[in-house]
C-alpha cells in the first residue's frame, strides 16, 4: 500500500534529513569517544582515579586496589575465602545506546590477587570469558562454585580442579527478563541459615527452572507478574529448590543484604528525578507499593487518599497493606549495600547499613 504521507517531493527532504541525523549521531559518538579516551588517559596517568577527591572518615584511608587496563567496567565484586577479589565485567553493556566499542570475545569474570601484600592487585586470572557472558550484574562465590546473575539466566559455574578457570556451567534459573538492562537479575548472597538470597528488578518478571518450567513459590503459585508485582526478593536452597518470594512490588531493588540474624535490607531506585530513592527492611509477604497491588496502575494515577508529596506518592504509601519505607534518601541510584558487623573499622560503623 502506498504511503499517502510520502510523496515524491518529500523524499529528497526526508533522505537529506536522515543523512544529517546519521552524520550528527556519528559526530556525537566520535566526540564522546574522544572525551572518554582523554578522561581514561588522565585516570591511568594518575594511577589513583578519583579516590583522592573522596571524603573519608577521620582515621581511615582509601586507596586504589586495581584499575584499567587490569579490569574494565566492573559491575559487581565478591571476596572469596582466600581473600581474592572476583570481578564481574560488563564491557559490552548497551553498545547500541552508548556507542561504546565491544569485546568480540564477550565479557569476563576476573580473579584479582595481591601476591606481594602491598595493597594493590598484581595478579589477574580470567576465570571465564565467552560471548554468552553479556553484561552480567551479579556474582557470588561459594568455595569452587560461582553463581552468576545475567538475565535471562542464573548460572552456576564450577572450578572442578581448582585452577582458577571455569570447567563447566549449568543453568540454575532462566526466563528472567531484563537482558542488557539494569533492572534484571541481581547478585546472590549466602545467608546465615545456609540458604541463598537474591532479587530482581521490575524487568525480571518471572522465574523458570533449568528445563524451562515455571518455578513455584512456597504456596505452589508460579512466580510471575500474574501472582506478583514488579521487582521481587527470593530465598532458596543451594541447589535452587524451595524458592520463596519474600517481598514484591519494588522498582529496581539492588542486591539484598542479609545480616547475621537473617534480617533483610535493600535499596530501591525510584523513577528518575522524583527524589524517591528508598531503603527497605524486607519482611516476608510484604507488598512494597511501587504500583497499585490490585490494578497495577502507576504511582502518578489519581486515587483515594493520594499522598501530597511526589516522593511519598511514588510508593503508594497511603494504600492499605503497603509496607512503609525505612528511609527515603532523595535522588540517586544506589547499586550496592552491606550490613557491617565486624570489628576492624571504628566502633561508629558497627551494625550499620552501608550503601
Language-model segment annotations:
Residues 27-353:
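Beta-propeller domains with acidic blade repeats across secreted/periplasmic ectodomains
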Residues 1, 353-355:
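Accessible peptide chain termini
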Residues 1-35:
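Bacterial Sec-dependent N-terminal signal peptides
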